[in-house]
């Protein structure tokens, strides 16, 4: 089923190291074409969903990429704070915004990025692409294991665990509407 997706096939071919199941069983980490595979997704809930699905794919079918430290998640900002006086600052989550509000006197303009596509080329380079200034999170096997487990539980056929998860975590949800 996974290999029916054209984008997944393209990714596998781009990596150059094969796929461990149903694609010739020819996974060979020594043929990897890139030192870093960077997942770039929006800083919102939808981006987190996409990242979780990709981590699940890597964990289940190409775990060596994670074990050998090749998978990273880019951390794009969620906000840009621009004070009347002083330097603008990128903020990566709501906690950072709350802290910024408490520690900065005076008025400031706040821009919220709904997605990477809302940034102009210069902003995207400065915040997410430039190796000198970007923030990358190395994916560890436990991150991928948890992503896979949550994906299986939320998308699987077993209703009781999903219902329980929703009830237990409903108050923690950050709605992006």
What feature does the model see in each segment?
Residues 1-177:
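Conserved phosphate-chemistry cores used by DNA topoisomerases
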């Amino acid at each position: 089923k996974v290999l029916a997706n054209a984008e997944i096939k393209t990714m596998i071919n781009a990596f150059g190291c094969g796929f461990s199941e149903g694609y010739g069983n020819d996974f060979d980490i020594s043929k990897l074409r890139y030192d870093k595979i960077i997942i770039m997704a929006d800083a919102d809930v939808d981006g987190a969903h996409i990242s979780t699905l990709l981590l699940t794919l890597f964990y289940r079918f190409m775990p060596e990429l994670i074990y050998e430290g090749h998978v990273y998640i880019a951390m794009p900002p969620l906000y840009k704070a621009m004070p009347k006086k002083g330097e603008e600052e990128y903020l990566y989550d709501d906690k950072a915004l709350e802290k910024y509000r408490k520690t900065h006197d005076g008025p400031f303009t706040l821009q919220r990025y709904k997605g990477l596509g809302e940034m102009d080329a210069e902003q995207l380079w400065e915040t997410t692409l430039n190796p000198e200034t970007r923030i990358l999170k190395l994916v560890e096997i436990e991150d991928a294991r948890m992503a896979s487990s949550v994906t299986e539980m939320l998308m699987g056929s077993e209703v009781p665990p999903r219902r329980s998860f929703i009830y237990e975590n409903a108050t923690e949800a950050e709605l992006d509407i």
